[in-house]
Amino acid sequence: MTASCIIGQLNYNDLYGGGSGRGRYMMPHRLLVYSTAGLFTATGIYALLAPQPYKKPLKFDTGLLHRVAAIGATAGMLTEVVLGFITARTADSGNGSGLKQKAQIHDAVGWTTFGFMTIAGTAWLF
């Protein structure tokens, strides 16, 4: 996810932030995103299939923080896939109407999703 965000930011800067506009980072970003989405999906399936070890009351602890952040990351990841597809298809069609705005939203959601994943991972570790 970290590499996807960094290369995605470089791609955004290249295409919409005053870069050369050659699309130098498009393919690396695409490959990283596919692998990130695949690993995220596999991890989510693994987590959903894990047995519940014991019942415990709902209280604010690292387990709850992890669950809330993981739900946020999942919502963000689904949004990223949809926004990325829409933005890429808009760019491919040559329709520049609202393209930069869609790319900005995609960029912001990507970093927000990264934040949720970081929180979920940190809560899981500690």
Regions found by a protein language model. Give the residues of each.
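Hydrophobic alpha-helical membrane segments
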Residues: 1-126
